[in-house]
Structure formats: structure tokens, C-alpha cells
Amino acid sequence: MARSVWKGPFVDGYLLKKAETARGSTRAEVIKIWSRRSTILPQFVGLTFGVYNGQKHIPVYVTEEMVGHKFGEFSPTRTFHGHAADKKAKRR
């Protein structure tokens, strides 16, 4: 079920403060965040966030198309190594 419209998008408070200070500074640096559940807002466009995936921070550059999605969607937590090869088919 989707979030109620009257509640508005969820964003952690510290994330808004970090983005605001990054907008004010001239240095382009990665903003490390652990909040994968936060919604990407229009004021985040053009910033780079390091989204934590459980092991390391994955750099995510926010574009217009990402607005409305969650940060966790752009930082995969699992690595797919492919399915195991069939041993019978390999011998032939």
C-alpha cells in the first residue's frame, strides 16, 4: 500500500540539513547517508549521496528522473553471481 498523500514524502531530518549545507558549500563532496528509506526530493537534484548498502557507501548522483523514488532503490544490497552450472551438461 502506498503512503498517504496528506502525510507527504518521508525524509529523515538530518538528511535535509546535510543537503542544505552541501548546497551552500562550493566543494562537491559525497554526502554519506544510512537512510535508504528516505524519499528523493527535488532539492536533492545535482547532489551526490553515498547510500549505505550494508557494506559500503555506493555513490548515487541524483537526477530529475529519481525524484519521488527511495535512495535504497539505487544501492543494491545483494550481489548476483549467476546460477550454478549444471554438472551433467558440463561433462557432455
Swiss-Prot record:
Function of the molecule: Protein S19 forms a complex with S13 that binds strongly to the 16S ribosomal RNA.
Any Pfam family hit: Ribosomal_S19
InterPro entries reported in the protein's UniProt record: Ribosomal_uS19, Ribosomal_uS19_bac-type, Ribosomal_uS19_CS, Ribosomal_uS19_SF
Gene this chain is encoded by: rpsS
Name under which the protein is recorded: Small ribosomal subunit protein uS19
Statement: the UniProt record of this protein carries the keyword rRNA-binding: yes
Domain of life from the UniProt record: Bacteria
Any one GO MF annotation of this record: structural constituent of ribosome
Annotated source species: Methylobacterium sp. (strain 4-46)
Keyword Ribonucleoprotein attributed: yes
Keywords in alphabetical order: Ribonucleoprotein, Ribosomal protein, RNA-binding, rRNA-binding
